[in-house]
Amino acid sequence: MTQFSLNDIRPVDETGLSEKELSIKKEKDEIAKLLDRQENGFIIEKMVEEFGMSYLEATTAFLEENSIPETQFAKFIPSGIIEKIQSEAIDENLLRPSVVRCEKTNTLDFLL
């Protein structure tokens, strides 16, 4: 004879999943949504336009709002936004001069 308690019975909703399985599924859906780099780029672009933030400020705010560590930005932020942050930093002299020399792109200013 098998013994069991009422705690062993899992409550099930209409989808057939327990509460724990539902919470895991919801968490996976949220992570999948955050991994959509293109959508994240649109959100950051919208923040820049609406609030007049720089790309660096908007990206930092996005990462903080979604509890994403700054070290993992490459998984969540599209390369186009990263390039815009780099160009902003160079234009606004936010980088050391030695770094700017390495990152400076070729221009046709000498033709002017």
Curated annotation (Swiss-Prot):
<dbReference type="InterPro" id="IPR042071">
    <property type="entry name" value="Trans_coact_sf"/>
</dbReference>
<comment type="similarity">
    <text>Belongs to the Tevenvirinae late transcription coactivator family.</text>
</comment>
<feature type="region of interest" description="Interaction with host RNAP">
    <location>
        <begin position="62"/>
        <end position="92"/>
    </location>
</feature>
<dbReference type="GO" id="GO:0140537">
    <property type="term" value="F:transcription regulator activator activity"/>
</dbReference>
<dbReference type="GO" id="GO:0019086">
    <property type="term" value="P:late viral transcription"/>
</dbReference>
<dbReference type="Pfam" id="PF16805">
    <property type="entry name" value="Trans_coact"/>
</dbReference>
<protein>
    <recommendedName>
        <fullName>Late transcription coactivator</fullName>
    </recommendedName>
</protein>
<comment type="subunit">
    <text>Interacts with the beta subunit of host RNAP RpoB (via flap domain). Part of the transcription activation complex containing host RNAP, the viral RNA polymerase sigma-like factor, the coactivator gp33, and the sliding clamp.</text>
</comment>
<comment type="function">
    <text>Activates transcription at late promoters when the sliding clamp is present. Binds to both the host RNA polymerase (RNAP) and the upstream dsDNA.</text>
</comment>
<dbReference type="InterPro" id="IPR031836">
    <property type="entry name" value="Trans_coact"/>
</dbReference>
<dbReference type="InterPro" id="IPR046384">
    <property type="entry name" value="LTACT_myovirus"/>
</dbReference>
<feature type="region of interest" description="Involved in transcriptional enhancement">
    <location>
        <begin position="106"/>
        <end position="112"/>
    </location>
</feature>
